Curated annotation (Swiss-Prot):
It is found in: Secreted. Disulfide bonds join C6-C14, C16-C28, C22-C39. GO terms for cellular component: extracellular region. The keyword Secreted applies. Belongs to the protease inhibitor I14 (hirudin) family. Residues 33-65 are annotated as: Disordered. Its main location: secreted. Pfam families: Hirudin. Coiled coil: none annotated. Keywords: Disulfide bond, Glycoprotein, Protease inhibitor, Secreted, Serine protease inhibitor, Sulfation. This is Hirudin-2A. Glycans are attached at T45.
Length: 65
């Protein structure tokens, strides 16, 4: 499953699964030592092109809490 964007709840959580899914010109910085991934300003690889409408799902609620 691929998630579209970072949350905007102050956690700055993003999921980096083989590509940058931060959007808005940001790149995904992988967390180390148990830290969360973060979207940071900077050039990243583009989102993968979606061939099906369902390729990008909304972020599940459990990630937004």
């Amino acid at each position: 499953i691929t998630y579209t964007d970072c949350t905007e709840s102050g956690q700055n959580l993003c999921l980096c699964e083989g590509s940058n899914v931060c959007g808005n010109g940001n790149k995904c910085k992988l967390g180390s030592d148990g830290e969360e991934n973060q979207c940071v300003t900077g050039e990243g690889t583009p989102k993968p092109q979606s061939h099906n409408d369902g390729d990008f799902e909304e972020i599940p609620e459990e990630y937004l809490q």
